[in-house]
């Protein structure tokens, strides 16, 4: 078996192996999606290792680059994402070998920590390699239509196929001349570890992605963008979920306006319920009543080099949004 870093000409073979090993799952696998995720990412090209038996690709392991910040501190991190082993070569330790080799490479590059949201079948393998459970991402929920939710759950109602065309608002707000200023002011007020965003990042994350459609709602005064909410609509077994993926505010002064953007969007899309990271719950305090539920993904972490691990545990000083952790 030979192991080497992936190159761009390997993408078709990588995608074929992912489909062979994992199937399509929820997110369709394609060369375009791989390029968006691992090459076009503003945080940098993903480190990827490939394993070959003769000329046959039998293993792939990819980490995705991410930057978190807290005040003036910036943490260089990676997210353990795509991995696949050829069905004829499973049980040979390929997943573990590639993962540990990639961790060593990341350590040499000065990466601080690695994080991911493993499923139940892969989590034990990560824990054996030194990962720790940080906890379940706390998610808050607002039930808008309890009766409709019950009907959906009982199979007596199905999701409407009517599409609300408000996609132009996403382009408008992501091209807003004041967006950069809003991002800077929002992050200046942050007291937790949060993603280091930029206009380029938001356009990549929410506009250039092809597998999910996102929407935006903003509040402006005097041609200045004061608050921005990014979200998506996710049909499910109990009705339509409006998932708030990111919120940016010039200051806490605009909490009420940000809340109104969300409640108006829920009505616009006729959603049964709304979800948001509990880390954002302070925005709605005294304005909107939310229920905190343990329905978020389990997040695991591993120190690579001088990571702020105590701050990450139980999200003590770590504030991922739903947009940070979903989809990837």
PLM regions with names:
Residues 63-68, 83-85, 118-121, 279:
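An acidic- and aromatic-residue-enriched active-site/binding cleft used to recognize and process polar
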Residues 85, 90-104, 253-264:
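Conserved acetyl-CoA-binding loop-helix of GNAT-fold acetyltransferases
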Residues 53-58, 62-71, 231-237:
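Acetyl-CoA-dependent GNAT
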Residues 49, 59-61, 78, 83, ...:
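Conserved GNAT-family N-acetyltransferase fold
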Residues 1-3:
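Extreme N-terminal starter segment of soluble prokaryotic enzymes
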Residues 74-87, 239-250:
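Conserved acetyl-CoA binding element of GNAT-fold acetyltransferases
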Residues 12-14, 18-48, 52-53, 107-109, ...:
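Amide-forming acyltransferase catalytic core, primarily the GNAT-like/NAT-type
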Residues 112-162, 221, 230-328:
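Active-site/acyl-donor-binding loops of N-acyltransferases
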């Amino acid at each position: 078996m030979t192991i080497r870093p992936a190159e761009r000409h390997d993408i078709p073979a990588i995608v074929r192996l992912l489909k062979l090993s994992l199937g399509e799952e929820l997110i369709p696998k394609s060369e375009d999606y791989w390029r968006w995720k691992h090459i076009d990412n503003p945080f940098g090209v993903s480190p990827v290792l490939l394993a070959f038996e003769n000329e046959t690709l039998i293993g792939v392991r990819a980490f995705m680059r991410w930057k978190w910040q807290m005040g003036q501190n910036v943490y260089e991190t990676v997210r353990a994402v795509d991995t696949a082993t050829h069905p004829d070569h499973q049980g040979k330790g390929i997943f573990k070998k590639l993962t540990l080799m990639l961790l060593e490479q990341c350590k040499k590059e000065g990466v601080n920590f690695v994080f991911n949201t493993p499923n139940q079948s892969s989590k034990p393998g990560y824990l054996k390699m030194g990962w720790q459970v940080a906890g379940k991402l706390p998610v808050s929920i607002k039930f808008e239509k309890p009766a409709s939710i019950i009907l959906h759950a009982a199979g007596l109602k199905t999701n409407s196929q009517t599409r609300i065309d408000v996609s132009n608002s996403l382009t408008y707000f992501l091209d807003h001349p004041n967006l950069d200023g809003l991002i800077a002011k929002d992050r200046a007020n942050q007291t937790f570890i949060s993603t280091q965003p930029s206009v380029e990042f938001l356009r990549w994350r929410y506009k250039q992605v092809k597998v999910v459609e996102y929407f935006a709602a903003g509040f402006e005064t005097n041609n200045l963008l004061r608050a921005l909410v990014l979200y998506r609509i996710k049909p499910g077994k109990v009705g339509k979920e409006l998932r708030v993926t990111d919120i940016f505010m010039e200051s806490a002064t605009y909490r009420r306006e940000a809340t109104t953007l969300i409640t108006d969007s829920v009505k616009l899309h006729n959603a049964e319920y709304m979800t948001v990271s509990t880390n954002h719950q302070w925005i709605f305090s005294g304005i909107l009543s939310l229920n905190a539920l343990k329905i978020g993904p389990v997040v695991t972490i591993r120190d690579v080099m001088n990571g702020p691990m105590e701050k990450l545990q139980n999200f003590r000083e770590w504030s991922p949004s739903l947009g940070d952790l979903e989809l990837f």
